[in-house]
Amino acid sequence: GKRGSALRSNLKTPAPVTQEVARALYEKTKKEKLRDGYTGSESGESFVGTEFAGRKTNFAPHLLTACDEEKARQLIADPNFVAQIKHDGERRYVAYKDGKTTFANRSGLEVPGKEEIVKSVEYLAAQGFSDFELDCEDMGSYLETFDILSIDGVDLRDKGFSERFKHLGGIELALRRSQHGAILRIVEILHEVDLDYLRANGFEGVCFKRTNGKYVNGRNEDQYKLKFWENATVRVKSKHATKSSVAIEVLNESNQWVGVGNVTEPANVPRPLIAGDLIDVRYLYAYQGGSLFEPTFDKIRDDLKESDALMSQLKFKRTAQAA
Protein backbone atom coordinates (compact mmCIF):
# COMPACT_ATOMS: atom_id res chain seq x y z
CA GLY A 1 0.00 0.00 0.00
CA LYS A 2 0.91 3.68 0.01
CA ARG A 3 3.51 4.85 2.48
CA GLY A 4 1.88 6.52 5.46
CA SER A 5 -1.49 4.84 4.96
CA ALA A 6 -3.03 1.74 6.44
CA LEU A 7 -2.12 -1.60 4.88
CA ARG A 8 -4.86 -3.46 3.05
CA SER A 9 -5.26 -7.22 3.03
CA ASN A 10 -6.10 -8.99 -0.21
CA LEU A 11 -6.58 -12.75 -0.52
CA LYS A 12 -4.55 -13.92 -3.51
CA THR A 13 -5.71 -17.53 -3.68
CA PRO A 14 -9.15 -19.06 -2.98
CA ALA A 15 -7.55 -22.09 -1.31
CA PRO A 16 -4.21 -23.04 0.29
CA VAL A 17 -1.34 -23.54 -2.18
CA THR A 18 2.15 -25.00 -2.05
CA GLN A 19 5.14 -22.91 -1.05
CA GLU A 20 6.40 -23.06 -4.66
CA VAL A 21 3.16 -21.59 -6.00
CA ALA A 22 3.03 -19.00 -3.21
CA ARG A 23 6.59 -17.88 -4.00
CA ALA A 24 5.77 -17.60 -7.70
CA LEU A 25 2.69 -15.52 -6.91
CA TYR A 26 4.71 -13.26 -4.62
CA GLU A 27 7.37 -12.68 -7.29
CA LYS A 28 4.68 -11.96 -9.89
CA THR A 29 2.94 -9.41 -7.65
CA LYS A 30 6.24 -7.77 -6.76
CA LYS A 31 7.25 -7.44 -10.42
CA GLU A 32 3.85 -5.98 -11.30
CA LYS A 33 4.25 -3.30 -8.63
CA LEU A 34 7.79 -2.45 -9.74
CA ARG A 35 6.66 -2.36 -13.36
CA ASP A 36 3.99 0.20 -12.42
CA GLY A 37 6.55 2.50 -10.81
CA TYR A 38 6.52 1.40 -7.15
CA THR A 39 9.76 1.27 -5.22
CA GLY A 40 10.68 -0.44 -1.98
CA SER A 41 10.69 1.14 1.45
CA GLU A 42 13.68 3.27 2.44
CA SER A 43 13.85 1.24 5.67
CA GLY A 44 16.22 -1.26 4.12
CA GLU A 45 14.56 -3.35 1.41
CA SER A 46 16.73 -3.66 -1.69
CA PHE A 47 16.46 -5.07 -5.19
CA VAL A 48 18.95 -7.41 -6.83
CA GLY A 49 20.97 -5.60 -9.49
CA THR A 50 19.63 -2.07 -8.96
CA GLU A 51 18.52 0.11 -6.08
CA PHE A 52 15.73 1.74 -8.04
CA ALA A 53 13.94 -1.10 -9.85
CA GLY A 54 10.76 0.26 -11.38
CA ARG A 55 11.92 3.86 -11.59
CA LYS A 56 11.11 5.66 -14.85
CA THR A 57 14.03 6.32 -17.20
CA ASN A 58 14.21 8.48 -20.34
CA PHE A 59 14.02 5.43 -22.63
CA ALA A 60 11.22 5.75 -25.22
CA PRO A 61 11.75 2.94 -27.74
CA HIS A 62 11.44 3.11 -31.50
CA LEU A 63 9.16 0.17 -32.35
CA LEU A 64 9.10 -1.87 -35.54
CA THR A 65 6.12 -1.78 -37.91
CA ALA A 66 5.04 -5.25 -39.04
CA CYS A 67 5.05 -5.96 -42.78
CA ASP A 68 4.27 -8.90 -45.05
CA GLU A 69 6.70 -10.70 -47.35
CA GLU A 70 5.69 -8.67 -50.40
CA LYS A 71 6.55 -5.44 -48.59
CA ALA A 72 9.77 -7.00 -47.28
CA ARG A 73 10.95 -7.83 -50.80
CA GLN A 74 10.26 -4.22 -51.82
CA LEU A 75 12.40 -3.03 -48.91
CA ILE A 76 15.21 -5.44 -49.85
CA ALA A 77 15.32 -3.81 -53.29
CA ASP A 78 15.12 -0.27 -51.89
CA PRO A 79 18.61 1.32 -51.54
CA ASN A 80 17.24 3.60 -48.82
CA PHE A 81 16.82 0.66 -46.43
CA VAL A 82 19.24 -1.74 -44.75
CA ALA A 83 18.45 -4.99 -42.95
CA GLN A 84 19.38 -6.67 -39.66
CA ILE A 85 18.50 -10.06 -38.18
CA LYS A 86 15.61 -9.83 -35.69
CA HIS A 87 16.43 -11.55 -32.41
CA ASP A 88 13.83 -13.06 -30.11
CA GLY A 89 14.75 -11.57 -26.74
CA GLU A 90 13.40 -8.94 -24.37
CA ARG A 91 13.85 -5.27 -25.22
CA ARG A 92 16.65 -3.79 -23.12
CA TYR A 93 17.96 -0.24 -22.84
CA VAL A 94 21.50 0.13 -21.50
CA ALA A 95 22.91 3.47 -20.36
CA TYR A 96 26.29 4.29 -18.88
CA LYS A 97 26.70 7.71 -17.29
CA ASP A 98 28.85 9.08 -14.49
CA GLY A 99 30.17 5.61 -13.69
CA LYS A 100 26.73 4.04 -13.32
CA THR A 101 25.09 1.44 -15.57
CA THR A 102 21.31 1.56 -15.95
CA PHE A 103 19.03 -1.01 -17.59
CA ALA A 104 15.42 -0.43 -18.62
CA ASN A 105 12.65 -2.48 -20.21
CA ARG A 106 10.40 -1.66 -23.14
CA SER A 107 8.16 0.41 -20.84
CA GLY A 108 11.13 2.60 -19.90
CA LEU A 109 11.23 1.34 -16.32
CA GLU A 110 14.53 0.46 -14.68
CA VAL A 111 15.23 -3.25 -14.27
CA PRO A 112 18.10 -5.27 -12.77
CA GLY A 113 21.06 -6.23 -14.93
CA LYS A 114 23.33 -9.25 -14.76
CA GLU A 115 26.76 -8.70 -13.27
CA GLU A 116 28.51 -10.13 -16.35
CA ILE A 117 26.75 -7.63 -18.59
CA VAL A 118 27.55 -4.74 -16.23
CA LYS A 119 31.24 -5.71 -16.39
CA SER A 120 31.14 -5.65 -20.20
CA VAL A 121 29.54 -2.19 -20.16
CA GLU A 122 32.22 -1.00 -17.75
CA TYR A 123 34.86 -2.46 -20.06
CA LEU A 124 33.62 -0.18 -22.85
CA ALA A 125 33.86 2.79 -20.52
CA ALA A 126 37.44 1.80 -19.69
CA GLN A 127 38.20 1.79 -23.43
CA GLY A 128 37.25 5.46 -23.66
CA PHE A 129 33.54 5.27 -24.51
CA SER A 130 31.69 7.51 -22.06
CA ASP A 131 28.08 8.49 -21.43
CA PHE A 132 26.47 6.16 -23.96
CA GLU A 133 23.01 4.65 -24.49
CA LEU A 134 22.43 1.35 -26.32
CA ASP A 135 19.26 -0.28 -27.61
CA CYS A 136 19.40 -4.06 -27.34
CA GLU A 137 17.63 -7.39 -27.11
CA ASP A 138 18.31 -9.20 -23.83
CA MET A 139 18.92 -12.86 -24.70
CA GLY A 140 19.44 -13.92 -21.08
CA SER A 141 23.20 -14.33 -20.80
CA TYR A 142 24.14 -11.73 -23.41
CA LEU A 143 22.79 -8.69 -25.30
CA GLU A 144 22.26 -8.23 -29.03
CA THR A 145 22.89 -4.51 -29.62
CA PHE A 146 21.20 -3.12 -32.73
CA ASP A 147 21.21 0.66 -32.22
CA ILE A 148 22.93 3.43 -30.28
CA LEU A 149 21.15 6.53 -28.99
CA SER A 150 24.05 8.58 -27.65
CA ILE A 151 27.79 8.42 -27.12
CA ASP A 152 30.28 10.65 -25.29
CA GLY A 153 27.28 12.64 -24.09
CA VAL A 154 26.15 13.48 -27.66
CA ASP A 155 22.54 12.59 -28.46
CA LEU A 156 22.29 10.68 -31.76
CA ARG A 157 18.51 10.31 -31.96
CA ASP A 158 18.22 13.03 -34.63
CA LYS A 159 20.87 11.34 -36.77
CA GLY A 160 20.04 8.78 -39.46
CA PHE A 161 20.35 5.08 -38.68
CA SER A 162 23.43 4.65 -40.90
CA GLU A 163 25.24 7.44 -39.07
CA ARG A 164 24.27 5.99 -35.69
CA PHE A 165 25.45 2.55 -36.74
CA LYS A 166 28.93 3.87 -37.56
CA HIS A 167 29.38 4.53 -33.84
CA LEU A 168 28.42 0.92 -33.11
CA GLY A 169 31.22 -0.11 -35.47
CA GLY A 170 33.76 1.57 -33.21
CA ILE A 171 32.31 -0.18 -30.19
CA GLU A 172 32.44 -3.54 -31.98
CA LEU A 173 36.14 -3.12 -32.73
CA ALA A 174 36.82 -2.53 -29.04
CA LEU A 175 34.76 -5.56 -28.03
CA ARG A 176 36.58 -7.85 -30.47
CA ARG A 177 39.77 -7.37 -28.51
CA SER A 178 38.32 -9.07 -25.44
CA GLN A 179 35.96 -11.75 -24.18
CA HIS A 180 33.29 -9.08 -23.72
CA GLY A 181 32.36 -9.39 -27.39
CA ALA A 182 30.45 -12.55 -26.46
CA ILE A 183 28.40 -10.60 -23.89
CA LEU A 184 27.76 -7.37 -25.81
CA ARG A 185 27.14 -8.48 -29.38
CA ILE A 186 26.52 -6.09 -32.27
CA VAL A 187 23.76 -6.99 -34.76
CA GLU A 188 25.42 -6.58 -38.13
CA ILE A 189 23.85 -5.08 -41.24
CA LEU A 190 23.08 -7.80 -43.78
CA HIS A 191 24.76 -7.30 -47.15
CA GLU A 192 22.43 -9.86 -48.72
CA VAL A 193 18.95 -10.81 -47.51
CA ASP A 194 17.76 -14.31 -48.43
CA LEU A 195 14.35 -14.70 -46.80
CA ASP A 196 14.11 -18.40 -47.71
CA TYR A 197 17.47 -19.13 -46.10
CA LEU A 198 16.65 -17.20 -42.93
CA ARG A 199 13.28 -18.92 -42.61
CA ALA A 200 14.72 -22.40 -43.20
CA ASN A 201 17.45 -21.87 -40.60
CA GLY A 202 15.13 -20.92 -37.77
CA PHE A 203 15.65 -17.17 -37.53
CA GLU A 204 12.80 -15.23 -35.94
CA GLY A 205 12.70 -12.62 -38.65
CA VAL A 206 14.41 -9.66 -40.25
CA CYS A 207 14.27 -5.89 -39.63
CA PHE A 208 14.44 -3.13 -42.24
CA LYS A 209 15.62 0.37 -41.32
CA ARG A 210 15.65 3.55 -43.37
CA THR A 211 19.23 4.72 -43.66
CA ASN A 212 18.39 8.36 -42.84
CA GLY A 213 15.61 7.51 -40.38
CA LYS A 214 15.79 9.26 -37.02
CA TYR A 215 15.23 7.45 -33.71
CA VAL A 216 11.71 8.32 -32.54
CA ASN A 217 9.31 6.95 -29.97
CA GLY A 218 6.69 4.56 -31.32
CA ARG A 219 6.14 3.20 -34.83
CA ASN A 220 6.56 4.89 -38.20
CA GLU A 221 7.53 4.03 -41.78
CA ASP A 222 11.27 4.15 -41.08
CA GLN A 223 11.56 0.73 -39.41
CA TYR A 224 9.81 -2.52 -40.36
CA LYS A 225 9.91 -6.16 -39.32
CA LEU A 226 9.05 -9.39 -41.09
CA LYS A 227 8.53 -12.33 -38.73
CA PHE A 228 8.67 -15.89 -40.00
CA TRP A 229 6.15 -17.05 -37.40
CA GLU A 230 3.53 -15.19 -35.41
CA ASN A 231 4.00 -14.16 -31.80
CA ALA A 232 1.37 -13.02 -29.30
CA THR A 233 1.19 -11.95 -25.68
CA VAL A 234 -1.56 -13.84 -23.84
CA ARG A 235 -2.73 -14.28 -20.25
CA VAL A 236 -2.70 -17.57 -18.39
CA LYS A 237 -6.29 -18.39 -17.50
CA SER A 238 -5.71 -21.59 -15.53
CA LYS A 239 -3.47 -24.63 -15.20
CA HIS A 240 -4.56 -28.08 -16.36
CA ALA A 241 -5.32 -30.42 -13.48
CA THR A 242 -3.30 -33.37 -14.81
CA LYS A 243 -1.24 -32.16 -17.78
CA SER A 244 1.70 -29.77 -18.08
CA SER A 245 -0.30 -27.14 -19.91
CA VAL A 246 -2.16 -23.92 -19.27
CA ALA A 247 -5.30 -22.39 -20.74
CA ILE A 248 -4.64 -19.02 -22.35
CA GLU A 249 -6.82 -16.01 -23.13
CA VAL A 250 -6.79 -12.57 -24.75
CA LEU A 251 -8.72 -9.35 -24.24
CA ASN A 252 -11.29 -8.54 -26.94
CA GLU A 253 -12.67 -5.17 -28.07
CA SER A 254 -15.44 -5.40 -25.46
CA ASN A 255 -12.81 -5.65 -22.73
CA GLN A 256 -13.71 -9.29 -22.08
CA TRP A 257 -11.27 -12.17 -21.74
CA VAL A 258 -11.68 -14.81 -24.45
CA GLY A 259 -10.04 -18.23 -24.41
CA VAL A 260 -7.73 -19.10 -27.32
CA GLY A 261 -6.77 -22.65 -26.42
CA ASN A 262 -3.99 -24.26 -24.43
CA VAL A 263 -0.21 -24.27 -24.56
CA THR A 264 2.27 -26.75 -23.08
CA GLU A 265 4.27 -25.50 -20.11
CA PRO A 266 7.88 -26.59 -20.78
CA ALA A 267 9.96 -28.28 -18.12
CA ASN A 268 12.61 -25.54 -18.27
CA VAL A 269 10.24 -22.62 -17.64
CA PRO A 270 11.99 -20.14 -15.25
CA ARG A 271 9.22 -20.57 -12.67
CA PRO A 272 5.86 -22.36 -12.53
CA LEU A 273 3.18 -20.51 -14.46
CA ILE A 274 0.16 -19.32 -12.50
CA ALA A 275 -3.18 -17.80 -13.43
CA GLY A 276 -2.76 -14.16 -14.39
CA ASP A 277 0.74 -14.52 -15.82
CA LEU A 278 1.42 -12.79 -19.12
CA ILE A 279 3.38 -14.97 -21.53
CA ASP A 280 4.47 -14.86 -25.15
CA VAL A 281 3.50 -17.76 -27.40
CA ARG A 282 4.44 -18.56 -30.98
CA TYR A 283 1.84 -19.90 -33.37
CA LEU A 284 1.14 -20.36 -37.08
CA TYR A 285 -2.23 -18.60 -37.18
CA ALA A 286 -5.45 -18.08 -35.22
CA TYR A 287 -8.91 -19.37 -36.09
CA GLN A 288 -11.70 -16.78 -36.13
CA GLY A 289 -13.66 -17.36 -32.92
CA GLY A 290 -11.39 -20.25 -32.00
CA SER A 291 -7.91 -21.14 -30.83
CA LEU A 292 -4.31 -20.58 -31.85
CA PHE A 293 -2.94 -23.24 -34.20
CA GLU A 294 0.19 -25.06 -32.93
CA PRO A 295 1.04 -22.62 -30.12
CA THR A 296 4.32 -23.05 -28.24
CA PHE A 297 5.50 -21.29 -25.10
CA ASP A 298 8.14 -18.62 -25.71
CA LYS A 299 8.74 -16.67 -22.51
CA ILE A 300 7.19 -15.03 -19.45
CA ARG A 301 6.48 -11.31 -19.93
CA ASP A 302 6.71 -9.66 -16.52
CA ASP A 303 7.57 -6.40 -18.32
CA LEU A 304 4.14 -6.03 -19.98
CA LYS A 305 0.62 -5.24 -18.78
CA GLU A 306 -2.72 -6.95 -19.37
CA SER A 307 -3.57 -4.28 -21.93
CA ASP A 308 -0.85 -5.81 -24.13
CA ALA A 309 -2.70 -9.15 -24.36
CA LEU A 310 -5.18 -7.96 -27.00
CA MET A 311 -7.11 -10.03 -29.51
CA SER A 312 -6.32 -7.41 -32.15
CA GLN A 313 -2.69 -8.59 -32.22
CA LEU A 314 -3.68 -12.06 -33.52
CA LYS A 315 -3.14 -13.01 -37.15
CA PHE A 316 -6.16 -15.01 -38.33
CA LYS A 317 -6.21 -17.75 -40.94
CA ARG A 318 -7.60 -16.53 -44.24
CA THR A 319 -10.87 -18.15 -45.23
CA ALA A 320 -12.02 -18.82 -48.76
CA GLN A 321 -14.51 -16.29 -50.08
CA ALA A 322 -17.93 -17.59 -51.11
CA ALA A 323 -18.55 -17.64 -54.85
Task: Identify what each model region corresponds to.
Residues 1-48, 142-156, 160, 254-323:
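Intrinsically disordered, low-complexity regulatory tails
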Residues 25-32, 170-174, 201:
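Generic, well-ordered alpha-helical scaffold segments in large soluble proteins
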Residues 53-59, 144, 150, 171-190:
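TOPRIM metal-binding catalytic domain and adjacent DNA-binding surface shared by DnaG-type primases
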Residues 4-11, 110-116, 247:
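A short, polar/proline- and glycine-enriched secondary-structure boundary/capping micro-motif
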Residues 65-108, 176-303, 323:
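Nucleic-acid 5′ end/cap handling module spanning
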Residues 72-178:
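Covalent nucleotidyltransferase
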Residues 36-46, 131-136, 177-188:
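Short glycine-rich, low-complexity/disordered patches
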Residues 42-82:
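Conserved, charged/glycine-enriched, solvent-exposed linker/hinge segments
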